Amino acid sequence: MAASFLPSILVPLVGLIFPAIAMTSLFIYIEKQEVN
């Protein structure tokens, strides 16, 4: 029972966390470029 619910929880979680990490790393990269 629990295993069938895991994908429906993990997919949105990964879908929200991965873009958040990507945007954060991109923001840090841009900030470093402006400093240099």
Swiss-Prot record:
Listed SUPFAM superfamilies: Subunit VIII of photosystem I reaction centre, PsaI (SSF81540)
A cellular-component GO term for this protein: chloroplast thylakoid membrane
Pfam families: PSI_8
Membrane topology: Single-pass membrane protein
Membrane-traversing stretches: 9-29
Keyword ATP-binding appears in the UniProt entry: no
Superkingdom as given in the UniProt entry: Eukaryota
Signal peptide (from-to): none
Biological process per Gene Ontology, one example term: photosynthesis
Function: May help in the organization of the PsaL subunit.
Listed HAMAP family: PSI_PsaI
Protein family per UniProt: Belongs to the PsaI family.
The protein, known as: Photosystem I reaction center subunit VIII
Species the sequence originates in: Tupiella akineta
Lineage of producing organism: Eukaryota, Viridiplantae, Chlorophyta, Ulvophyceae, OUU clade
Gene: psaI
